[in-house]
């Protein structure tokens, strides 16, 4: 596999022989949004995130965070939570005729989301540290993400991620 990385106006060419060491493939999408996510089977990173990261340590941090979601089975837990909500949606529909429009399914799926994100931050940092990546500026990476996505700065009951200040302080500790 050969590829080229452009960082700080420098072109670097790499050639690697892939070996399977992890059961979660990393898939790069062409999307310009600054985002990465895990689905329980794979890790997805957008071109926007690749462009946003200023160092390999930051990319490792993002990948490790998403890997932690998969390794800690957060996606499976969300699916299980959603099933509980689905049962309630169905019962209300059958017993009252009211269409909840999946409200309970959606709300139950988001149960513990902020805790899952905090755990993925912690486990991801640990993975980076034991892998030899520099995590000194990890909190500042998340601060930059907060500036890029101002909606993540404030906390509210519907948020799926901790607020940016909460995340920054948690990682700094």
PLM regions and their residue ranges:
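A Zn2+-metalloprotease active-site environment signal
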Residues: 1-173
């Amino acid at each position: 596999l050969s590829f080229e990385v452009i960082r700080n106006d420098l072109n670097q060419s790499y050639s690697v022989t892939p070996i399977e060491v992890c059961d979660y493939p990393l898939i790069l999408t062409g999307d310009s949004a600054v985002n990465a996510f895990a689905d329980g089977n794979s890790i997805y990173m957008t071109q926007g995130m690749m462009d946003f990261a200023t160092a390999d340590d930051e990319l490792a941090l993002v990948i490790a965070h998403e890997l932690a979601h998969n390794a800690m089975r957060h996606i499976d837990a969300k699916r299980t939570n959603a099933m509980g909500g689905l049962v309630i949606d169905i019962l209300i529909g059958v017993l009252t005729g009211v269409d909840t429009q999946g409200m309970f399914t959606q709300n139950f799926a988001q149960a513990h989301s902020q805790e899952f994100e905090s755990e993925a931050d912690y486990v991801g940092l640990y993975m980076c540290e034991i892998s030899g990546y520099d995590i000194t500026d990890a909190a500042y990476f998340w601060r930059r993400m907060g500036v890029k996505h101002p909606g993540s700065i404030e906390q509210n009951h519907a948020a799926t991620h901790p607020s940016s200040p909460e995340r920054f302080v948690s990682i700094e500790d």
